[in-house]
Regions:
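RNA pseudouridine synthases
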Residues: 1-327
Length: 327
């Protein structure tokens, strides 16, 4: 505690420094023994002295249940590709620490005498499908660079293709790495027949959001911080309840597939956040589920050589949802 702040009650001190909680909340934390002064619990809302050392011993948060089953699709002893279930966070963040794929991998492989496979990239919590991991740091670095290079080259190639009105199939195919996603979107909204492809070049930028301050959504591309983004969307199947699409992305922007589908008037079926136009609903958050999005196919050239082509074995929760809905 610095001299100008001496004499304040502890609750006033904390409420002024940490505005996420009011004074009454800090008084409750004092009573619970969470605040320590000079190595001892400060159970009363005492006035502070200059030089006091305060520690807030925050209790661990409660993490909700997540699906903990995942299938290993490929493993060569270094590179590992898994089929991540929807609802499982990949890395600790946003209130998730132990109930994450990273922690599951650490617990599964700890004590096995080999390096632990660790994720090379992210998938959204409610995105299922293929996730690339690697045991050796140099392999993770190589794969991460390969993914970045294919994304950057794909974005440049998509822009060039758009300028001449063709070449959408090149999106996501550059640099020896290709990723394809599948998703359910609201029915009848796309100006496509099955098998036809649409190139989407809507920019993505941060805009005001009442809950989060700012959030990523569709943008004009004219404001500072707006990011160029490109996706190639192909309509695969139509049904009265939902349409099945395949998407290749040439830029790894936040929530890109959700935003781009919504931007062209075909939001992901069940997406509570992004509606037609690609703007964010004020009452929803990015981590809210309900949509069906899958990292379906992966093509890459591993450091060991050769070509690796994998598809998610769960043939899409999308198809399961169609069956459950009586399609």
């Amino acid at each position: 505690v610095e001299p100008p702040l001496a004499g304040q009650p502890a609750s006033v001190f904390y409420a002024a420094r940490h505005r996420h909680s009011d004074r009454a909340c800090w008084q409750a934390r004092l009573a619970a023994g969470e605040i320590w002064r000079n190595g001892q619990p400060l159970l009363l809302d005492a006035h502070l002295a200059s030089g006091d050392r305060l520690v807030w011993r925050r209790p661990p948060w409660l993490e909700g249940p997540v699906p903990a089953d995942f299938q290993v699709v490929y493993d060569d002893g270094d590179l590992q590709v898994i089929d991540k279930p929807a609802g499982l966070p990949v890395l600790p963040a946003g209130g998730w620490l132990e109930h994450t794929l990273l922690r599951l991998l650490e617990r599964r492989h700890r004590g096995a005498g080999a390096a632990i496979p660790r994720p090379v990239h992210r998938l959204g919590r409610y995105t299922s499908g293929l996730l690339v991991c690697a045991r050796q740091p140099q392999t993770r670095a190589w794969l991460s660079a390969s993914l970045r290079e294919s994304t950057a080259a794909g974005l440049a190639g998509a822009a060039a293709a758009a300028a001449v009105g063709s070449g959408a199939a090149a999106v996501g195919e550059v640099g020896g790495c290709r990723k394809l996603y599948r998703a359910l979107v609201v029915p009848g909204a796309l100006p496509l027949a099955p098998g036809e492809t649409l190139l989407i070049n809507t920019a993505i930028g941060r805009r005001e959001h009442p809950q989060l301050g700012q959030i990523w959504c569709a943008a004009t591309g004219s404001q500072p911080g707006d990011l160029a983004a490109s996706s190639s969307l192909t309509l695969l199947e139509c049904s009265p309840q939902a349409d099945l699409v395949q998407v290749a992305i040439a830029s790894g922007r936040p929530h890109q597939i959700r935003i781009h589908c919504a931007a062209v008037g075909a939001p992901l079926w069940g997406d509570p956040l992004y509606g037609p136009g690609g703007q964010a609903a004020p009452a929803a958050r990015p981590g809210d589920g309900g949509y069906q999005l899958q990292a379906w196919r992966l093509e890459l050239q591993p450091p060991s050589g050769g070509a690796l082509v994998l598809e998610a074995p769960r043939a899409l929760g999308v198809m399961a949802l169609m069956a459950e809905s009586g399609r």
